[in-house]
Amino acid sequence: MFPISETSPVQFRPPLPDLCDTVVIGGGVIGVMTAWHLAKAGQTVVLCEKGRIAGEQSSRNWGWVRQQGRDPAELPIAMEANRIWQDLAKECGEDLGFRQTGVLYLANKAGDMAGFENWLQFAKAHQLDTKLLSKAEVSAMLPSARADWPGGMITPSDGRAE
């Protein structure tokens, strides 16, 4: 089970060092990863957060680790972030709540499929595992759904993190 929750006490571990190379302000996902990589590079880092590390805004962003639907210029960065998330739990020896569950976009109308087909060319150019789903495939995937979607797009390597 992921070790951080609303019941986990906010802790401060004094004393702060007299000197450090870098102070990172903000203990959300960006601040934590910045501090982590700077420390791995040999810098002495102090991470400051007003409340709970990884328990403020980062805990409410839906947690998507998503490549699908990204701007083509962002896609290589999103793919690298996905790779980092896959390796991070092993590297730090903790369950970070990352689950590779895939991300599914559903078409509300037939015209939405054209947009999905457009984006698929970028996914293919980067060897991403995105694929289009027919109406029948979506219905089989979501048999209890009340809506009748004309199709969808899924990237199985996408996921979520807590």
Regions found by a protein language model. Name each.
Residues 1-22, 37-41:
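Extreme N-terminal leader/targeting segments of oxidoreductases
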Residues 31-32:
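N-terminal Rossmann-fold NAD(P) dinucleotide-binding loop
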Residues 153-162:
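Helical element adjacent to the flavin cofactor pocket in flavoenzyme catalytic cores
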